[in-house]
């Protein structure tokens, strides 16, 4: 069974039971990238040509996605990882957590490169009511995932796990 508490018997990668999870992991590894390998000169040139409304949109996106990446990372680490038994799923989730951290580094790289007020960009998600409400909604389920130990072996525990998983993923 895929969902449940991992045991010592669940720590062997081979034989692989969930080939799809291992395939996702291998694909994720092949898609590895690093923010500082991306030259932003053309983007900076485009920035200079943007209208104030276009610049506002970029700032708004930066403000939304930067904290969102950390929320997703925490959700995976504390809300999913402990409740999936298969080591091939753990491989993929570990790589996905790395990707979320890499996205944070990418946003930081953009904030350092572009003429943006970093403090203002970091605070927008707390000041815009719709962003704040969305974040509060997600955090409610993230807390459920991280502050309580789900009785994952029970039907109710599995339902709660799936509910939390859907709530944090659909909204994000």
PLM features per residue range, with description:
Residues 1-172:
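Non-heme di-metal
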